[in-house]
Amino acid sequence: MKAQNAAAASLVTISAPTVQKVLWSAIAFTLLLVATFTAASGWSSLTRYEIMGTGYLPRSVVPLFLLIVLINAGIRVFSPSFALSRSELLFIFEILSSIAAVSGQEFANHFYLNLLGLVYYSSPQSQWFNAFTPHLPPYLVPSLNFRDPAILWAYEVMPEGARLPLSEWLVPLFVWTPYLLGIYALSLFICLIFSRQWEEHERLLYPLTQVPMELSGSDERPCPTFLFRSLLFWLGFIAAALPYALRALHLYFPSIPDPQPQRNSGVLFPSGPLTAFNNLELHYYPEMVGIAYLLSSEVGLSLWLFPFIRRGEVAARMAMGMDMYHAEFLTFQSVAAYLVMAASLLWVARGYLKEILAATLRLLAKVVTFFAKRTENSVPLPAPTEAKALLGTIAVFAALLAWAKWVANVDLSWTIMLLLGLLITGLVVARVVAEAGVYIYSPPFRVYQVMFDVFGKNRIGARNIVLLTAMSWAQLRSTATMATGYFVNSLKLGSLCGLGRLTTATWILVAVLVAMIVCHVTFPTVIYSYSVPKLSWWAQTSSLNTANLIGQYLTTSRPLTPHHWWGFIIGAATCWLLIKLRLSFVGFPLHPIGFITWFG
């Protein structure tokens, strides 16, 4: 049975909820929460490597939101005029979840330490002496001299009574912030362009939005009292929370047994190709157990099945005598799958995107000529939100290119490739989160490293390698989550509660700026107050590992092998076939998202 081609259908309009307004007092309270959460999360990630914003249902945002809901219920009883509405509660969740990872792996954990490391590890005592600083404009780092207090005190104990050298950061942070904010804006605009298509036409599930929607109650009663009175709810809560609670207590009190929710199968096969199935992950993630109930059967099956298929592929390679380059093979397989998936998303939405382009041209005509010709037979165009987002995408993309060319002095061709890589990976990750609700997920490859592997240091050049890596410390490098996953969920929540996508997007961008400014103060302060050797285990070696990675690309050549290219070909063909079968046969049991998510 042939499925109707999604691209041939016109836009489907769903009646939106009544437009709601958020009071300025609620907005101010939300931004205060943003600043507080960012500062606390930044300190926690540097000193203990506890990432409070991890996951597209951020691990610390959900309990904080639940606490706000309960307090708001009490306020509604005693002073209803001061209570928050349901839309305002959801607004708080949208904004907090959108900035949750800014102070973690998404940006701040890497940016400040790595900027310092580029200078410190260019010193004579390092194996990378003078490898990085000749390529760095002086206004992009606190200092180019490793003996300067702004660099040295970060790695060695600051003299007693000395003032924190925060003033040395003013110029580099002033120069970097427009670029960093532009990266987030670019990610947000691409989500804004596709949100209406995914929500109203393709009707994606957005499983993760169900949690805040249920916790926020209803418009009449913004506190889910029926939920808290449910025995089934509390049984599920205990089953989910108990293993983690015992695990946390065990770390402080070893006499308490450790349930070890993350285990592996150990060695199942001592030798031969089947060793690829050793150390199978046997992880208990209660959040994904719950989310799985909200997924379609083919998505759930694919997320479970494809990890075994991946290991089977490695076993087949070993059986054919190929015992090396498994990681490279799978990585390039993922790169190809991402490209094919992104192309398919554009193809399926081509009719919708044509309408947006027409609306954008009409909007431009209004701006340039102050009038637009109308006829009675004019085809209704989409609301201008998507047109504004498209214009914003073009404007921000151009501004980022200008920054790279005239501020960072990076070649435009490589910058264009880097930013296109961000758009492709961000779009695919947003789709995975919107359709499959995966709790923690980011691309299994780094865009800039793929560029370095494909084109090599001789073609790209040392200066471009150093600066492109530095430009990738926001969004283009995340190893846990990407902002687009948070953004699509927040835009969906804005639609569900009647706030509107454009309003939601505007305040998300404001909140990102607030979070970034707080990070600019928090992270250098914590780094100098503790010094790198006294930070968390991860922070102690982060900048050194980055310096080693860049140094290796500067000093060694990594030519591509047939393993890379065969991985690319097989990945593209497999992803295309899965997409074709999904579009051609209703009920086909395998979903390309399973292939995208688990390979690599």
Give residue ranges: language-model regions.
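Extended non-catalytic scaffolding segments
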Residues: 547-568
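Ordered core of a single globular domain
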Residues: 402-404, 485-512, 516-522, 574-588, ...
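Short, Lys/Arg-rich, polar N-terminal cytosolic tail immediately upstream
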Residues: 1-19
